[in-house]
Amino acid sequence: MDGDVKGAINESILEKNGQDKKSGAGQYFTPRSLIQAMVDVTRPQIGETVCDPACGTGGFLLAAYDYMKNQSQDKAKRDFLRDKALHGYDNTALVVTLASMNLYLHGIGTDRSPILCQDSLEKQPQTLVDVILANPPFGTRPAGSVDIDRPDFYVETKNNQLNFLQHMMVMLKNGGRAAVVLPDNVLFEGGAGETIRRELLKNFNLHTILRLPTGIFYAQGVKANVLFFLENKPY
């Protein structure tokens, strides 16, 4: 069976599970139409690096790969895309396995999976990236997680979504683009939220806020938005 066919079958299974609220898989799945819209706006280019710091089953990374794979026939660029361009993190071992399998069935990471089982908030990023696509988990940090205390963050907070936003802000290259799904509290919360929003507006071009319909996520009726921003800090 052709690899693309295997991959499509696997994606369909993941999507069906994502639509099943009783299975609990919905927390790992972002609707494909929303993923595609976020990729279309950020426009990743072959030769660039793409990261999802809360990658779930790898939908964003796979969509970015599909967007870039026909941009060039240059072997070096295609090898880079397949082996080095994509970076994903998730702190749940089962989900990392699902994501790795999902990408593998599309011919990505055949020698080494680009997905790491790691809480991406715990450490400063080792490298900066060109594009970030993410739908971080809503709610509080899992039981047993360490408190986030990072010198590269703008402010200390226990708000998981604000910490993910800070993490993405510090890991973008100059001129990098990000699209991230975040709940309403990120837009309206005072204190740490106000500080982070001020930094976002000062050092980045927050060009679009896309309001999502309530219930767009299969397992939760959370009011959410997509923030699209460019890194343009003065150097």
Q: PLM features: what roles do these ranges have?
A:
Residues M1-G18:
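Long recognition/docking surfaces used for binding and targeting
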Residues K16-Q19, G144-R150:
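Gly-rich Lys/Arg/Thr-decorated short loops/hinges at beta-loop-alpha junctions or inter-strand turns
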Residues G24-A134, G139-R141, R150, K158, ...:
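Conserved S-adenosyl-L-methionine
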Residues L172-A178:
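Short glycine-dipeptide loop
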Residues L212-F217:
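Short, solvent-exposed loop/turn elements at beta->coil junctions and helix N-caps
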Residues Y218-Y235:
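Flexible, glycine-/basic-rich loop-and-beta segments that form/coincide
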